[in-house]
């Protein structure tokens, strides 16, 4: 009997577990179905958005009892992750609130929590979308207009904070302004005086804020034909225009208007008092930007009109397109399809809007959000999907950019070159070059011939020399790059008179016979330590002739391809290290690479990158070489600055890596210590598994890591000091010489050079920012010429 009872109990237990698993599985299926329904609501289907919403409300209302928390989480996630469907979800919440007031209150609390958490964690876009959602709930009678205005007023209070960065104050004002298109009409009808008071406070702030950063972020220095407006100024002008139109905009879909009779009967909730978290030194705020304008209504005569620069519709359309790129940029085909499937495409000249927004992203200062090639690949997919219209709009945009290139920012010039050469390579290098031949009459340093020259250099990297020669009209002969072949001086006609010729020929034979690095060292010992003049050098000096013979001979033998060159450098790495003991010796190596490969810019870039990776040359040596007198003729060419930026990036990555490793080691050490103390305090039955000695770094290891990081920071600071000091020297010399000779200093060379200085500041702003006080004390002092000093002051203003 007892056995039977035990057997029955086991069966009951098994049935209970099986039923529990079934219930869990069924619940998971229902949750997944609910999530799918909520995510897809309002998307294209056979029924209307309103019908979709009514059906979904019925489903959710029935499941609120069981899946309340899940529904709250999904809806609040949608509010942040799918801002383009904001009004669809606010309508859904409004209808649920009308049927279940308690759920409406819970959702508002949940949304407020999301908003506060986003502010605390510096998730600025998520915070702005949360605020927009809360504001739109006023239109759905979920939240009272009075409590929303209190929140907006509290956010504008931040604009009066003292001793905080302007970028913090700017963001809170921007968040409020960008919310008003959704809720402005309702606030105007219900609380007009309070709304006007809010706008007055915003205007007072905007009138007194500094815009020192503005010129550094402009794509063009000229405002003709389109003004390059600072983002807050532009949005303020758009909001003022909206106010003049009595807050009536024509872009935002408002499905809740259909349900007004239901929603207006619902009880409203008041937002709690929300205080923005105080500023902390670790907080990073979005940097300011300049609104990019390329087209106006005269550029797109056919079809619907392009909204004016100060219409709120222009802001809303651009923001939506930027969000599509942000969401889908990882997959270029999906991104292009989503852009062309823009919901309001029949109301606007969509191709013009898309092209303008993509170039706005590409030319965004200080740096684009994504790699240049991301935007190029999306434009190619757009041309494939819309072959009848988009290539023509893109050609029109290219023409506009080329005609305005005289006043284009140097960083944007580089990006334009990179994009156009890549685009040409995907369309058989076809272009109507004859239309641009007027640039051939201009000085070689003028941006237009310079642009074509740099484009052809980039095309050479993506093709081959004969192809470039064939594709260009004969009139462009002077701009076509020289054939990319090595200039090995020990085989020239005058080679017999060169001091190192005998050893060079001996070295060629030995390397071809696959000699060892030791044998190369022995051969090089035959070269005495003399300069090129033949005079005996002191023992402490590097042997320039030895470096000359070795570097030029080895790299000439490896000139067949990048791989051959890399293999040669790797095999004789020890010889390079022995020869490159001092910075002067390293500069000599770079000089010989340039002498050998002066007609092959890409080879120079990849070889110097390789030498940096193998630590044969230091970053400071590369910087010093770039500013040396022998490189004067190359100074305005793009490849030289490509080398400088990859050098700085190499140093920056090294510092960041050491910083990360040190932080992780300190964290492990801290956790190990706390784990050890916790283990001592725990009871034997609840003892935690301690962190092993293998996982825990010793204090000595951490100290060594700190020393390494400190040394890296010193080297990084030295690199920036070298770069900026050289810029100041050559620019000051130019300005002084121009003043003495009574010439206009504003030459093409000067504009390129000041542009490159600005580019270094902006491209590496996160790392340079650490040393801004040092730079101000040592280099960018008040007695410096105002033209140079202004570049530094604009940079500092970006984070001020």
From Swiss-Prot:
The modification Phosphothreonine is found at residue 9. It comes from the Eukaryota. GO terms for biological process: 7-methylguanosine mRNA capping; mRNA export from nucleus; negative regulation of viral genome replication; nuclear-transcribed mRNA catabolic process, nonsense-mediated decay; primary miRNA processing; regulatory ncRNA-mediated post-transcriptional gene silencing; RNA splicing; siRNA processing. Signal peptide: none annotated. SUPFAM superfamilies: ARM repeat. It is found in: Nucleus. GO terms for cellular component: nuclear cap binding complex; nucleus; postsynaptic cytosol; presynaptic cytosol. InterPro entries: ARM-type_fold (IPR016024), CBP80 (IPR027159), MIF4G-like_typ-1 (IPR015172), MIF4G-like_typ-2 (IPR015174), MIF4G-like_typ-3 (IPR003890). Keywords: mRNA capping, mRNA processing, mRNA splicing, Nucleus, Phosphoprotein, RNA-mediated gene silencing. Residues 1-25, 668-700 are annotated as: Disordered. Residues 31-243 form the MIF4G domain. Its main location: nucleus. GO terms for molecular function: mRNA binding; RNA cap binding. Component of the cap-binding complex (CBC), which binds cotranscriptionally to the 5'-cap of pre-mRNAs and is involved in various processes such as pre-mRNA splicing and RNA-mediated gene silencing (RNAi). The CBC complex is involved in miRNA-mediated RNA interference via its interaction with Ars2 and is required for primary microRNAs (miRNAs) processing. Also involved in innate immunity via the short interfering RNAs (siRNAs) processing machinery by restricting the viral RNA production. PANTHER family: CAP BINDING PROTEIN, NUCLEAR CAP-BINDING PROTEIN SUBUNIT 1. Belongs to the NCBP1 family. Component of the nuclear cap-binding complex (CBC), a heterodimer composed of Cbp80 and Cbp20 that interacts with m7GpppG-capped RNA. This is Nuclear cap-binding protein subunit 1. The gene is Cbp80.
